[in-house]
Amino acid sequence: MESMLTLAHLQQRRSRRWLFGLTLLLLVTLLISLCAGEQWIPPGEWLSAKGQLFIWQIRLPRTLAVLLVGAALALSGAIMQALFENPLAEPGLLGISNGAGVGLIAAVLLGKGVLPGWALGLCAIFGALLITFILLRFARRHLSTSRLLLAGVALGIICSALMTWAVYFSTSFDLRQLMYWMMGGFGGVDWQQLWLMIALLPVLCWVCLQSQPLNLLALGEVSARQLGLPLWLWRKLLVVATGWMVGVSVALAGAIGFIGLVIPHILRLCGLSDHRVLLPACMMAGASALLGADIIARLALSAAELPIGVVTATLGAPVFIWLLLRSRGRG
């Protein structure tokens, strides 16, 4: 009994160290993100005339958007991996990201380039929620988790086909907008998108408080049901929360991959399996990772900015291949 208490105490201390380290990492990347750019502006100059423009009007809204989207994508990945008992699950697996893409592309094509940014954001959220509610219709039939997963994959393929057709028939101007969205980027984010950032906050906070049901889900469907967890209810709530977070993220920055896949899995490999620690750790690590990718996207080229989706794919693809090989070796 004493050894078990000692082990629990050591595990608690280790978790606190991880959370402290991730908090420190987030603060450092946040500071660098605000300072870095075509001109390096140290904190001492943030209140100057130059700082008022570059920091408070340009870099701060972008940095906040990157932080929130990174946290949302990593949290969505943690939810998917617990819900589907699959370490390779990620936010786009259920087709929700592609659904948001279809909504945004439909707005671009039908709006003829005259729709304001907030309308495009609403269309992306609507597309994500539409796919989410279709999935909930499947869930009402009490499908198994694996069948619900396959239904999401099928919906994602359909949405991907629709996006391909849209690109094929689009004009040159619309095509540039669509290709920029497909590669992901925060270049157009300013304070006008503040409402989208605020829309993420309540769902992020709610998901972070759901460690107990997620811990039960991680035990497997049978064990969770035996312990009294209403699977159908929590499956619906978590799918809707994921749909909302992914939809708002796509509306802010377009398609960004690998954050939701890699971050939760790496943290689990580091021993953070308890969702009481994993969820806040995912938020901070996801935000830090996407902030780092955004800094690279801004500074890699002197005359242009790389799409952040390209950066995350370049850095995340080798890790994804390693995860595939590792999971195959375990299987």
UniProtKB/Swiss-Prot annotation:
The chain crosses the membrane at residues 18-38, 64-84, 91-111, 114-134, 149-169, 194-214, 243-263, 277-297, 305-325. GO terms for biological process: cobalamin transport. SUPFAM superfamilies: ABC transporter involved in vitamin B12 uptake, BtuC. One of its GO terms (molecular function) is vitamin transmembrane transporter activity. One of its GO terms (cellular component) is plasma membrane. It is a multi-pass membrane protein. Keywords: Cell inner membrane, Cell membrane, Membrane, Transmembrane, Transmembrane helix, Transport. Pfam families: FecCD. CDD domains: TM_ABC_iron-siderophores_like (cd06550). It is found in: Cell inner membrane. The keyword Transport applies. Signal peptide: none annotated. The complex is composed of two ATP-binding proteins (BtuD), two transmembrane proteins (BtuC) and a solute-binding protein (BtuF). Part of the ABC transporter complex BtuCDF involved in vitamin B12 import. Involved in the translocation of the substrate across the membrane. Belongs to the binding-protein-dependent transport system permease family. FecCD subfamily. NCBIfam families: PRK03784.1. This is Vitamin B12 import system permease protein BtuC. The gene is btuC.
